[in-house]
Amino acid sequence: MSKQPQQRYAEAIVNRKARHEFEIIETFVAGIQLAGSEVKSVRLGQASLNESFAIILRNEVWLENMQITPYKHNRMEVLEAKRSRKLLLHKKEIAKLQAKVSEKGLTLVPLKAFFTPHGLLKIELAIARGKKLYDKRETLKNRENQRHLDQLRKQYS
């Protein structure tokens, strides 16, 4: 009998816009409560963190607008793709987050979703402040200058 080819799973789902649009102040790692078919979809890379955010309601942290495409081989009920999902944190961590987010201009933004070596899905969550347009331009300008300097160093070394 021939050996079945191993299926490759997605490494991590990254929210690329988050680092561009927000100034990251502090990061946390949280578990996420999902249905079985949602975990299978995330393993296949059929998830997106774009435009997602987290809110704190009644001492619980909820992830909003995370897109998880329904698993195509699911025989059970089909879940909504952008439903609210509960994040799993300790009470002390939630209290700390709530105290920091209550400051003006701070929000909770997911940076990436990844699997631990034990197969658990975790969300890297950040306390962030929105950047102004001129901050974004300045960041792009600095990045471009650094890239140019690196090219010159490589050329003359």
Curated annotation (Swiss-Prot):
Keywords: Cytoplasm, RNA-binding. GO terms for biological process: trans-translation. CDD domains: SmpB. It is found in: Cytoplasm. Pfam families: SmpB. InterPro entries: SmpB (IPR023620), SsrA-bd_prot (IPR000037), SsrA-bd_prot_CS (IPR020081). It comes from the Bacteria. GO terms for cellular component: cytosol. GO terms for molecular function: RNA binding. Transmembrane segments: none annotated. Required for rescue of stalled ribosomes mediated by trans-translation. Binds to transfer-messenger RNA (tmRNA), required for stable association of tmRNA with ribosomes. tmRNA and SmpB together mimic tRNA shape, replacing the anticodon stem-loop with SmpB. tmRNA is encoded by the ssrA gene; the 2 termini fold to resemble tRNA(Ala) and it encodes a 'tag peptide', a short internal open reading frame. During trans-translation Ala-aminoacylated tmRNA acts like a tRNA, entering the A-site of stalled ribosomes, displacing the stalled mRNA. PANTHER family: SSRA-BINDING PROTEIN, TMRNA-BINDING COMPONENT OF TRANS-TRANSLATION TAGGING COMPLEX. Belongs to the SmpB family. NCBIfam families: PRK05422.1, smpB. This is SsrA-binding protein.
